[in-house]
Amino acid sequence: MKNTSSELSSSSTDDRDGDITKLPSNGSQRDVMTLVLLFTTVTVSCILVYNSSNNPLMVLSPWKLNWFSQNKTSFKPREPASELERVLMNAAMEDKTVIIAALNEAWVAPNSIFDLFLESFHVGIGTEKYLKHVIGVCVDDKAYERCLHLHLHPHCYLINATDYDQLSGKNNYMTPGYLKLIWRRMEFLREVLALGYNFLFTDADILWFRDPFPRFFPDVDFQIACDHYNGNSSSKRNWVNSGFTYVKANNKTIKFYEFWCGSRYRFHDRRKHDQEVFNLIKRDPFVDQIGIKMRFLDTLHIGTFCEPSKDVINV
């Protein structure tokens, strides 16, 4: 009887199984979900790897991608707001330093001293690499046109001036045209600092025999050549020559140039050029107050007409 009951029970179960569809067990469900998740993970990973070859930012999570798309403008270089800023950006070294030479029609005439200035960069020791960082700052149209046809192209900038007649010709020392040219140059240099660019200003009648940058003092705001050097680079008793000046852009130098340019009108005799005014204000309490750090360059290395270097090996 036991065998019969067992057979009946088994037969009955088989019949039910044949009539009713079996439901998957919990273990089977987990296996299916695991396969689906694995397939999805592999597919997404392949897509990310493929896209990252063209855009590495695609490996970021969706919310980070969304944040980046909303803020991507902060990662783009800022477009220049003016023609001057465009020229500065194109000519600047990695540390935002430019070399500036002021030009007018007389300075850039064919076979002029300016041609020798450019040639000195080619033949000087370690100087040719700096030619691409030189900006010809022109005060009249003819100087600008000639600048564009020389090695400086495209780093030429035309100052917006309404008095070309006084600025473009041969201006003898201390004539009204000379003084106007000097102070127009000073205002331009102040503007360069305000835009955040360091500069090395060089008169166009200076010949670059060697790379001057190793001679500059580190961590100094303002460095200037001397007509007469007393042997102490920190002494304000040195008599300066503003035709070769290295300045780093910061709040101290911007304030100093504003003070320097504004001081032209502080004195009864306004027929003063920038060097005379500098020598009058260099001990002013305001200069100490802003904390600008100055150094005066040895004429052994940076020679001038008043005190030419006696060492041809080092000048």
Where are these regions (language model features)?
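Beta-strand elements of modular eukaryotic interaction domains
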Residues: 86-90, 125-126, 134-135, 190, ...
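Short amphipathic alpha-helices and their capping/turn residues within compact interaction modules
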Residues: 122, 126, 139, 152, ...
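GT-A fold catalytic core of metal-dependent nucleotide-sugar glycosyltransferases
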Residues: 2, 180-254
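Acidic, Ser/Thr-rich intrinsically disordered and amphipathic helical segments
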Residues: 44, 83, 98, 112-116, ...
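Active-site-proximal specificity loops/subdomain of glycosyltransferases
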Residues: 112, 137-195
